[in-house]
């Protein structure tokens, strides 16, 4: 591609350097330096076409843009009809290894008020610029570059001296470590810990007898790790007659291919440990979960229904809220002169494994927003002096609209009282994007885990279906009261029970003999969220035939409705409607109604917004007993709630619980380790269950005298965040 341009100052023509084929940062830097030395003084143009009076006021600027805009500019410049799309001009070079592309993206969004994607900044042109025209983006902190720039206009288009590809670092992995943990647990599992083992015991060391309480995913992963890594005597206690815990899948009678996820339901692709387990166990049947906006969605607000077509902008009434939230995701938040990293920036730092940047940016959010509820944090950001999107939200309308629209998976109104950081954490960790539905059901994971054979026995053979009552320290070890006057003694115990059981049945927080005061406080005061679901197996997938929305968000009783297709290759097959998925107060008000009454209440409520949908909604074969299923997690005697959700100022509880087995905070060796998603930074998500299982199993082996080879959670230097 040859491009020749004419300089009005030097009265000479010159060609631009085509650097598109250069993919080595060092070589690109050398070529651009040669270009600067050769051309910068000869072709410098003031934006109005005047000769620059002082050459040292001119710098070599980089105009970042998309491939389409680049090709258009090269084919028409320097003529006035040059096509201009989203172009961001800055002094930041395209070969800087220390600056991720995402920082350029956030700076561009802050300076120009546009929303940029990676594709929008994938190419560059080298332009002569006058320094006085540059505008600095707000600083993210002393450890981050101050990026100067401006948005190009018709009047300031200059003839480029070179063009090429943006080689700044960019993350590509869909899986990445969590922001609070910054450790590659998948790498640890993949490195042999979950298969052949990575530990050994000296000959003189007696291997411990270990009990695992709870046969949910965390308990079964803990047991697998113990057995694979040399602990031979492992017993699992499970109070229910099935395995899985909150990974609870209900299969309908006579329909083995359609299942209702009563517990964990959405599985973000960013969860590295979860998808390692799925691959390891050979579970690969999945489809996209029908989150709002990813499918045709119905919205019901103040007595009126609005239709939102898949992958398009939401209805006009939601414009200000949608634009503001999208801008926040990409541009972050500016509070005076301080800028806070956008969630997208933080996520990209995680993808790049740039833990130094990620931890510094996250700590800034923690310092400023840990004491905010989700509601007060949203008001501070969108009703303050510099709201993302440029328009302040109104309290009476926009805040209500945001409660219904939510942050990706639906309305968050019922949990507006939880901590702002807790919800921001979900977004940064990628839990609201690229969410999958497992067609075999999440319970397939614990089922296959329990079928594994290690040594002479399967893990299922090691499960005793009895409830553990009190856990007592004795001179000979840890005694478990398992009912009817029976006791069993173990050297070490891993507890994956819910907090209510740990406190009121196991009595582990009665004193400080097992855990420190701080850990006991975290167990007793962590907030467990109430949640209810009601599913209806339908005769057919009526919403498809009638072109009705596959997802409905309403301000009524139902709150969120999802139509699920477990047999996409079978158009005439049964359908499944999650008629109501509610949290907290919205869940609590339904508790006194049985499933028949509840179904009629929800159907009547839905008829206000989508009467045709309500008319067609009936259980298959008219079987109300078998084809309607509901579950209220706050009433589950062994769960005590659906998932942990931190309130303001309580993120430190997650820190205490997550690191309890590692004893990083001076914990006593009480011979009891905690595990489970509620002991993680991601309550209710499978990822946290697996991470804490790794911590507990490896700590149990270490404390019993085992030797662990290679990188592992016990030797990792975790970031000591201040919550």
Swiss-Prot record:
Binding residues for substrate: 266
- Cofactor note, please? Binds 1 FMN per subunit.
Enzyme class, UniProt record, top EC level: oxidoreductase
Q: Which Pfam families match?
A: Amino_oxidase (PF01593), RolB_RolC (PF02027)
GO MF annotations for this entry?
L-amino-acid oxidase activity; tryptophan 2-monooxygenase activity
Q: Where is the signal peptide?
A: none
Q: Where does FMN bind?
A: 218, 238, 246, 266
State the UniProt keywords alphabetically: Auxin biosynthesis, Crown gall tumor, Flavoprotein, FMN, Monooxygenase, Oxidoreductase, Plasmid
Similarity comment text for this entry: Belongs to the tryptophan 2-monooxygenase family.
Q: What is this protein called?
A: Tryptophan 2-monooxygenase
Q: Which organism is it from?
A: Allorhizobium ampelinum (strain ATCC BAA-846 / DSM 112012 / S4)
